[in-house]
C-alpha cells in the first residue's frame, strides 16, 4: 500500500466512526465530564465574586473566558494561585491576560485612496 491509500483508508475509517451514534454519544459524554470537572476546579479556586465576574465575561466574550478558565486551571494545578482567588486578584490576572492577548494580536488597517 502506498501512503496515499493508507491516508484514504484512515480518512474513511474516521468518517465512519464520526457518523456512528454510539461514538457521538461517547464524545458528548466525555465533553460533559470535562466541563463538569472544569467547573468543579473553578468553584474551588474562585471566590463567589470572581465566579460571577467570570460568568459575565463568558456572556460578553466566550473565547476570552475559555482562555481565562484554562489559564486559571493551569496556574492552580501548578500551585501558583492563592485559594480562594479574590475578585481583586482576579481583576489583576484578567488585566495581565488581556494585555498578553492584545500584544500578540496584529491589527491590519487598510487605507483606501
UniProtKB/Swiss-Prot annotation:
Residues 1-12 have a biased composition (Basic and acidic residues). Keywords: DNA-binding. This is DNA-binding protein Mevan_1162. It comes from the Archaea. Residues 1-22 are annotated as: Disordered. It holds the Pfam family dsDNA_bind. GO terms for cellular component: cytosol.
Amino acid at each position: 500500500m502506498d501512503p496515499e491509500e493508507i491516508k484514504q483508508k484512515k480518512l474513511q475509517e474516521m468518517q465512519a466512526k464520526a457518523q456512528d451514534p454510539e461514538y457521538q454519544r461517547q464524545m458528548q459524554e466525555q465533553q460533559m465530564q470535562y466541563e463538569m470537572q472544569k467547573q468543579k476546579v473553578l468553584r474551588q479556586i474562585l471566590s463567589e465574586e470572581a465566579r460571577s465576574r467570570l460568568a459575565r465575561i463568558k456572556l460578553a466574550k466566550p473565547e476570552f473566558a475559555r482562555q481565562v478558565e484554562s489559564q486559571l486551571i493551569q496556574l492552580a494545578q501548578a500551585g501558583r494561585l492563592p485559594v480562594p482567588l479574590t475578585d481583586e486578584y482576579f481583576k489583576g490576572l484578567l488585566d495581565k491576560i488581556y494585555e498578553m492577548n492584545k500584544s500578540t494580536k496584529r491589527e491590519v488597517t487598510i487605507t483606501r485612496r
